[in-house]
């Protein structure tokens, strides 16, 4: 299946709109009790349990995965959309004869539960598990084909035992480590944030302005896998949404350039900077160092220290977004030292500034004002030299120029330098400069990544405790594996209020322990893990949720993985999806997985909006899923969401009609009561025209589902309902076997989007439940061969006649037939024919 399919054409949308109107017109009044049908079939499905995946089944396996929800309140319209779309695929695979794993669980650690516990003076588990049960009952009523035997919650100790186990295994491989560094700090939630959780300088969760704080934190070394994470995106490109692949490529941010060593007065070790344009080194007229970096504090002279410290305090009050703003004046302080340009040998000043960040490389950047706009502005502000090293295009009237062109001033005319790259294009100039640096031992070619290691420590309570003990004598000591899970102590209400350190730090009985190695006094690590750690492997636990010997049964994971489709929002493109890919690769290298990627294909749904805007309480445009289900029923809401448009498009609830969907379902349901032939009657002797419509619908539905054009699939079912109603009310009548075949096909196809009405139809047609597992309708290939097609005859571009012809008619015969048609003869009206263009069997174009 491939998500990258073209959207429906305007003609298709118009056709679908027409079909909706036709299918929604009831031919008669009939009793159709939505609530009674739902109440009838839900307990039957619970008893039959038709969607329990059998690990030992000999059938080919499919893994249908949707992103598990956070348990905050009941399900909303977004949940309804994603699960309705996802369920089309899962139910389709069951009908096609696959053994399908379609599990569900809850991402149940996180801040909302902790904040609710503070407000309500309770334990976070109270809020969490109450909401889980509410959502669980709603999912069941919504009739999603989940295998509930595999249900999991990431906040259960039997789950997070294995999250802790994985952390320790990563640590043993050098992939989990602790360091002190400036981190993103949310002053509202009083916790650190990973780079990916900062959007435009603000906390993605609460919107507070993010500040920097120096803390010792735990990290996952995701950068060890940066190149592979990037390279394997090529494999995912055919089956993942293009915008997700692009977002991950940009986030990983691979660039090729060079490390260049600058010797600084009074310092034994050179300062190494990374640049993507080593060819511009002749234009390096200064060096800038992040003002809040340890390097700046080390380099500053005593004479400049007062000015430096005052400037540093001023900058510490600024947010990262303010520091990186392109429209603010550049500021800085001369550190009073110079560095030596390794190519020209000239001395250049070293400045501290706010527009370089401490966590970028070494925190130092070579200033090339002729090729970088920020450097240009800084040099202009501080009165520093500006030297262009790349020839600008004719007519260029800008400031810094970073584009292509021959090297100039490299070296400057008359200058004596050991390297001359003047006249070389950029790529050749870069190579020549790197070769020189490597020969001189003052630099080397290098690859750099924008991706930074994953900061996973959080200073909150409701998360996975980090299984590390700190001992003055032994250092960091892992909690022994046989003592996992390390469970959270019982804290509630005011005990959880943010204090800048984790609430666990105040749980003295829990935090103070004996060192497992020496037996001396020690303390537990009081931070908890980022909840994205929990969700980076949950899809593997689904393969064997009750397994007690490891995080998952390796053999069962081998049978089910990778997930064949993963459905969820695009907002997780560079967070959850990147982290899950990282975990999969580490587990593969540990010998626990055989796959390189966790998700073979991915589908991103749009969002449900209302009146052209995202739903919000402040705008008063919210739509309650519960109200919609109560008024129109589950099936009508599901059909509305699936039929609204391509899955990746947003749905404006003001523009769709659950009432129209309900009328369509009533019309489909009536068919099952009007069929008079017995169940099991062979269809072979039935009306051929209707059988052709049925066969074509089944054939098209399969292709449309596999290309994620679910909305068009629903339109085809609407067409079949109309054709069947016409056959019942006219010829060949309700007793014709083709009418039964068509109606049974409607029920099977509707089981993918409207399971309640489909089950009711199936029973009324004389069958036992469940229609969801009867199998895909078989199609006689002969019925797909058209007996006649319509050929259009145009004269001067205007349609003058339509002819019913055989699909294999020759161009000569079609031309002869068209030219003899009375309407064509009248339209030509004796004028000489200049040209006849024939495209058999569909078109004849006459030019007079």
Curated annotation (Swiss-Prot):
It comes from the Bacteria. One of its GO terms (cellular component) is cytosol. PROSITE patterns: AA_TRNA_LIGASE_I. Residues 1-16 have a biased composition (Basic and acidic residues). Its EC number is 6.1.1.4. Pfam families: Anticodon_1, tRNA-synt_1, tRNA-synt_1_2. It catalyses: tRNA(Leu) + L-leucine + ATP = L-leucyl-tRNA(Leu) + AMP + diphosphate. One of its GO terms (biological process) is leucyl-tRNA aminoacylation. A motif ('KMSKS' region) lies at residues 614-618. Residues 18-30 have a biased composition (Low complexity). InterPro entries: aa-tRNA-synth_I_CS, aa-tRNA-synth_Ia, Leu-tRNA-ligase, Leu_tRNA-synth_edit, M/V/L/I-tRNA-synth_anticd-bd, Rossmann-like_a/b/a_fold, tRNAsynth_Ia_anticodon-bd, Val/Leu/Ile-tRNA-synth_edit. It is an enzyme of class 6 (ligase). A motif ('HIGH' region) lies at residues 69-79. One of its GO terms (molecular function) is leucine-tRNA ligase activity. It is found in: Cytoplasm. ATP binds at residue 617. Residues 1-30 are annotated as: Disordered. Keywords: Aminoacyl-tRNA synthetase, ATP-binding, Cytoplasm, Ligase, Nucleotide-binding, Protein biosynthesis. Belongs to the class-I aminoacyl-tRNA synthetase family. This is Leucine--tRNA ligase.
């Amino acid at each position: 299946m491939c998500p990258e399919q073209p959207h429906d054409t305007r003609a298709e949308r118009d056709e679908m709109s027409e079909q909706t109107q036709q299918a929604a017109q009831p031919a008669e009044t009939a009793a159709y009790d939505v609530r009674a049908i739902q109440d009838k079939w839900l307990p039957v499905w619970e008893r039959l349990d038709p969607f329990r995946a059998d690990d030992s089944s000999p059938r080919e396996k499919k893994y249908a995965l949707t992103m598990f929800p956070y348990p905050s309140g009941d399900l909303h319209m977004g949940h309804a959309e994603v699960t309705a779309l996802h369920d089309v695929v899962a139910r389709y695979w069951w009908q096609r004869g696959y053994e399908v794993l379609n599990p569900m669980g809850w991402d149940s650690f996180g801040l909302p539960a902790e904040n609710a516990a503070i407000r309500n003076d309770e334990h976070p588990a109270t809020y969490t598990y109450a909401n889980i049960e509410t959502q669980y009952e709603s999912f069941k009523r919504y009739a999603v084909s989940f295998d509930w035997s595999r249900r999991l919650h990431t906040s259960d100790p039997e789950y997070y035992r294995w999250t802790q186990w994985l952390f320790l295994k990563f640590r043993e491989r050098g992939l989990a480590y602790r360091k002190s560094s400036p981190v993103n700090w949310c002053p509202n939630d009083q916790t650190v944030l990973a780079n990916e959780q900062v959007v435009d300088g603000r906390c993605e969760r609460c919107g507070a302005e993010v500040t920097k704080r120096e803390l010792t934190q735990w990290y996952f070394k995701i950068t060890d896998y940066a190149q592979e994470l990037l390279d394997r995106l090529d494999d995912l490109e055919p089956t993942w949404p293009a915008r997700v692949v692009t977002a991950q490529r940009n986030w990983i941010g691979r660039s090729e350039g060079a490390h260049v060593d600058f010797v600084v007065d009074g310092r034994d070790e050179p300062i190494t900077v990374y640049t993507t344009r080593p060819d511009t080194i002749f234009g390096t007229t200064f060096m800038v160092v992040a003002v809040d970096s340890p390097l700046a504090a080390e380099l500053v002279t005593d004479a400049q220290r007062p000015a430096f410290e005052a400037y540093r305090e001023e900058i510490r009050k600024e947010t990262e977004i303010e520091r990186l703003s392109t429209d603010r004046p550049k500021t800085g302080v001369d550190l009073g030292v110079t560095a030596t340009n390794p190519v020209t040998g000239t001395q250049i000043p070293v400045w501290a500034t706010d527009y370089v960040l401490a966590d970028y490389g070494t925190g130092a950047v070579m200033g090339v004002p002729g090729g970088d706009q920020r450097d240009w502005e800084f040099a202009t502000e501080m009165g520093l030299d500006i030297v262009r090293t790349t020839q600008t295009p004719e007519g260029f009237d800008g400031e810094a120029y970073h584009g292509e062109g021959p090297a100039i001033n490299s070296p400057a005319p008359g200058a004596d330098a050991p390297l001359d790259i003047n006249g070389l294009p950029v790529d050749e100039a870069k190579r020549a400069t790197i070769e020189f640096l490597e020969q001189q031992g003052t630099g080397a070619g290098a690859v750099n990544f924008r991706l930074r290691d994953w900061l996973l420590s959080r200073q909150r309570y409701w998360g996975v405790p980090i299984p590390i003990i700190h001992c003055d004598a032994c250092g960091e000591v892992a909690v022994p594996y046989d003592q996992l899970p390390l469970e959270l102590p019982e804290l509630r209400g005011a005990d959880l209020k943010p204090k800048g350190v984790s609430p666990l730090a105040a749980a003295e009985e829990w935090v103070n322990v004996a060192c497992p190695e020496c037996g001396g006094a020690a303390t537990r690590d009081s931070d908890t893990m980022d909840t994205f750690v929990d969700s980076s492997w949950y899809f593997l636990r689904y393969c064997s949720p009750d397994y007690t010997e490891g995080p998952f049964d390796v053999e069962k994971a081998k049978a089910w993985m990778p997930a064949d489709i993963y459905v969820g929002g695009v907002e997780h493109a560079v967070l959850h999806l990147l982290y899950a890919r990282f975990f999969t690769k580490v587990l593969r290298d540990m010998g626990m997985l055989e796959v390189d990627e966790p998700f073979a294909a991915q589908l991103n749904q749009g969002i449900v909006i209302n009146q052209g805007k995202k739903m919000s309480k402040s705008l008063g445009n919210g739509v309650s899923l519960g109200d919609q289900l109560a008024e129109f029923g589950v099936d009508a809401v599901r059909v509305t969401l699936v039929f609204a448009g391509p899955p990746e498009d947003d749905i404006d609830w003001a523009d769709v009609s659950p009432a129209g969907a309900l009328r369509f379902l009533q019309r489909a349901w009536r068919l099952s009561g009007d069929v008079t032939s017995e169940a099991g009657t062979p269809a072979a002797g039935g009306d051929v025209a209707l059988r052709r419509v049925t066969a074509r619908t089944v054939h098209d539905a399969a292709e449309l589902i596999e290309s994620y054009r679910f909305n068009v699939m629903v339109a085809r079912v609407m067409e079949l309902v109309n054709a069947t109603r016409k056959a019942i009310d006219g010829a060949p009548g309700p007793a014709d076997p083709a009418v039964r075949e068509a109606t049974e096909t409607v029920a099977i196809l509707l089981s993918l989007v409207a399971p309640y009405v489909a089950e009711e139809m199936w029973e009324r047609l004389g069958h036992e439940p469940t229609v969801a597992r009867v199998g895909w309708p078989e199609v006689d290939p002969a019925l797909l061969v058209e007996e006649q097609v319509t050929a259009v005859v145009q004269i001067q571009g205007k349609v003058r006649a339509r002819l019913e012809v055989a699909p294999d008619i020759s161009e000569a015969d079609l031309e002869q037939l068209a030219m003899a048609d009375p309407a064509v003869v009248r339209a030509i009206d004796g004028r000489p024919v200049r040209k006849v263009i024939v495209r058999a069997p569909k078109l004849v174009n006459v030019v007079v």
